[in-house]
């Protein structure tokens, strides 16, 4: 992970943990381990989903055995669909990503190059009807190429950590939810957009369309 990714991931995981939200990741090098560690350091809970068996002989990476012992405590949980003694394979990591997204209310991609397995997790999340957030990054940085691409494809850009905390805790509607029988509003579309942005801060076009039930060309 880059210094930028490390700082952002730490802030996100800590904020979620302090809000009582469980952080789920894959206990791999980089962003995964930062997410788990930051959640635990903040006094929160975390779940690690492995692409191998959960026994010491199979768990990978071996360098993360101390982290695994820390997660496997009062505030954490390690799970796997693979039996003890099953080593990680090239295909087991992408396969476990569907579990990471499946047990999560939202998926956040902090850093990813264009071929990153994190993009598989994002696709799984969309297929499962979950919200997908991506952290924007420099157009010159390869590890932001995947996240910037996700945003271009419609993922919600994560600009304010408070936004996802509020959404997961239920004080904001899911990006995938459409308003049910919204009350009539006589304000002009422009006034409604200004009001919405003043209440929630910067929003992706898709979120504006979903919230105001207008078409993209109108917005």
Briefly describe each language-model feature range.
Residues 1-219:
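Glycine-biased, small-residue-rich flexible motifs in mid-sequence functional cores and linkers
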């Amino acid at each position: 992970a880059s210094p930028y990714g490390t700082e952002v991931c730490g802030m996100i995981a800590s904020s979620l943990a302090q809000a009582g939200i469980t952080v789920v990741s894959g206990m791999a090098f980089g962003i995964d381990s930062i997410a788990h560690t930051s959640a635990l350091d903040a006094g929160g809970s975390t779940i690690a989903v492995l692409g191998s068996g959960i026994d010491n002989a199979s768990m990978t990476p071996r360098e993360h055995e101390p982290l695994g012992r820390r997660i496997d405590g009062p505030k954490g949980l390690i799970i796997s669909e693979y039996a003890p003694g099953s080593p990680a394979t090239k295909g087991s990591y992408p396969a476990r990503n569907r579990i990471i997204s499946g047990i999560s209310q939202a998926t956040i991609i902090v850093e990813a190059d264009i071929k990153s397995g994190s993009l598989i997790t994002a696709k799984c999340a969309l297929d499962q009807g979950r919200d997908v957030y991506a952290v924007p990054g420099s157009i010159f940085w390869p590890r932001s190429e995947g996240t910037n691409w996700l945003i271009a494809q419609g993922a919600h850009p994560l600009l304010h950590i408070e936004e996802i905390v509020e959404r997961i805790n239920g004080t904001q509607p899911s990006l995938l939810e459409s308003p049910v029988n919204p009350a009539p509003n006589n304000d002009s579309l422009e006034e409604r957009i200004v009001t919405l942005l003043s209440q929630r801060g910067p929003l992706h076009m898709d979120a504006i369309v979903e919230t105001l039930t207008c078409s993209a060309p109108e917005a």
